[in-house]
């Protein structure tokens, strides 16, 4: 298992997997952390997966991922079209995507939704992440939203002013 550090280590971070239920979940939830990691480990490969989208939002999601990932050495961006709000009912098909993903990549670090998130789609992705990637370092991100389900984080990543401004600029793009 990768030992997490924002500084240079004997074991450099090489592969990150980002999982988001909806367009802009990853950017809002862990975009600043990703920008910090990319600046520290530019030789990264990032797999960026968004599970719910439509044609217009898929274009926006891809453009946003491209902006956030412009500093990495390689990337794969996938946007699926699962129906928003129905992940619990599409769980078997989504699980099949996770099983294929497990065969395709072996990430050092995975970002997924917080397990206590009140949105059903977010919870499904969290459960499938922990079920599928049992021997990986998994960090959960929270998304501030109307139902106020921000918990007590066990990891806080300080962002520099420049990183914060970059994240905001990308989100407004």
Report the location of each language-model feature.
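Active-site beta-strand->loop->alpha-helix modules in alpha/beta enzyme cores, enriched
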Residues: 1-23, 27-146, 151
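Phosphate-binding/catalytic loops
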Residues: 147-161
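A conserved mid-domain beta-alpha-beta active-site/ligand-binding segment of alpha/beta enzyme cores
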Residues: 157-173
